[in-house]
């Protein structure tokens, strides 16, 4: 059984493990510390299985817009619908905090993530050219109105 809760400072190392296993250029530990401790717009959540963090999602909530900063599930735990559970929770939290729309960027090559986002009603809104610094890949910008 997976549980989702707000991320706390003591989760940073476990989140870093997920981050390093998921992205070619992972965020640094200090970035997550600042997000959790200092950024008033940041809302981060972790998903746990058997008491172990296996994924996380971050949002910035600014006025009435939510922007997904990052979402990742450890590769060993993918295929269990944890990403969908976590994303659903993040969207619900965005609505509860007054967001009326949500946006994110996703690699144009990440069709699995795009498919999941489409399940939640997100639609393409544009392309950010050369967005990803590791290989210059474009990002697909996706949006959805929240209810």
Outline where the language-model segments fall:
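Acyl-donor (CoA/ACP) binding surface of acyl/acetyltransferases
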Residues: 77-80, 84, 129-131, 138-140, ...
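Acetyl-CoA-dependent GNAT
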Residues: 2, 6-76, 87-89, 93, ...
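Conserved acetyl-CoA-binding loop-helix of GNAT-fold acetyltransferases
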Residues: 79-92, 115-119
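Active-site acidic-Proline motif in GNAT/NAT acetyltransferases
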Residues: 74-76, 80, 108-110
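Conserved catalytic-core motifs of GNAT/GCN5-like acyltransferases
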Residues: 105, 118, 123-140
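Conserved hydrophobic beta-strand within the GNAT/NAT acetyltransferase core sheet
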Residues: 68, 102-106
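Short glycine/proline-centered loop/turn elements that form peptide/ligand docking sites
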Residues: 87, 109-113, 130-135
């Amino acid at each position: 059984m997976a549980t989702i809760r707000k991320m706390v400072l003591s989760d940073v190392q476990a989140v870093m493990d997920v981050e390093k296993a998921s992205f070619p250029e992972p965020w640094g530990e200090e970035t997550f510390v600042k997000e959790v401790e200092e950024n008033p717009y940041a809302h981060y959540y972790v998903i746990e299985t058997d008491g172990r963090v296996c994924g996380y999602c971050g949002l910035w909530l600014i006025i009435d817009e939510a922007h997904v900063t990052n979402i990742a599930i450890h590769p060993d735990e993918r295929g269990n619908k944890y990403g969908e559970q976590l994303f659903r929770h993040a969207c619900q939290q965005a609505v509860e905090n007054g967001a009326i729309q949500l946006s994110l960027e996703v690699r144009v090559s990440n069709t699995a993530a795009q498919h999941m986002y489409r399940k939640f009603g997100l639609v393409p809104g544009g392309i950010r050219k050369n967005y990803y610094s590791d290989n210059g890949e474009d990002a697909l910008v996706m949006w959805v109105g929240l209810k």
